[in-house]
Amino acid sequence: LAYKKEMNVNWCTSCKCVLANEEVVNGVCERCGSEVVHRVKSQSMLKITAYADKLIDGLDGLDYIERVATQQKNWIGRSHGAEVNFGTTAGDTLTVYTTRCDTLFGVTYMVLSPEHPILDTWKDKLTNWDDVAAYREEAAHKSDFERSELNKDKTGVRLEGVCAVNPATKEEIPIFVSDYVLMSYGTGAVMGVPGHDQRDWEFATKFGLPIIEVVQGGDITKEAFTLKDDTGIMVNSGFLNGMTVKDAIPAMK
């Protein structure tokens, strides 16, 4: 259950200690007011994700205030999905976690966390490394709360010199580094499906990236089509065309 991990943390430059996200206010330590930066440190962790289902189901039998129980369930999280490997023109592989592998044909870009370790290995391959390094430094001074705020302006830097390869279409797609992707969540890399995720749609619109409809319905020229059930019909998706989302998900695994 317990293990050690090298991970990105909030580091107070004055207290010389790790801070929880709640202890970082507007980029400074709530206790001393000093600047907080991101550092990679060895931390003791609990493997909560391996017990997510048990922990969430166990909350139903506890005499908790409903609000507290809901907060606990949201914090633990329950997610059923798959890891997908994307090749790159650098010869490396990027792994993402997704609950919607049926939308792979609609992936038009990828995004890496500024702390993703693969970026350092690509330093000599990226023609705009100085821009990437400057963006990473800027992100290091933001809290995870600031970075993951849904309504914040989307920022990022496109990597010049390395592309990813969509495993479904075999086409090269651009890779960005953006601070809304956190190294502490998932693999630190996400796939962009702008036709069916609103945050991806906003990012793609800002950077002029293709938006492909792979689940029929809605008007993706105006916003992402985010049908919540699994009855949608697949389009522009090769062998998945005509299937429902429900049937397409297991067909892609």
Task: Report each predicted region and the residues it spans.
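Residue patterns forming the tRNA-binding/recognition surfaces of aminoacyl-tRNA synthetases
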Residues: 1-94, 101-102, 189-253
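Short glycine-rich loop/turn motifs
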Residues: 79-83, 107-108, 159-161
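Short acidic, gly/pro-rich beta-turn/loop elements at beta-sheet edges
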Residues: 106, 185, 245
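Short, solvent-exposed loop/turn segments at secondary-structure junctions
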Residues: 102-103, 117
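Short hydrophobic-aromatic micro-motifs
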Residues: 46-47, 95-97, 104-113, 173-177, ...
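Alpha-helix boundary/capping residues
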Residues: 59-62, 111, 125-126, 139
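Short acidic-glycine loop/turn motifs at beta-strand connectors
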Residues: 88-91, 114, 167-168
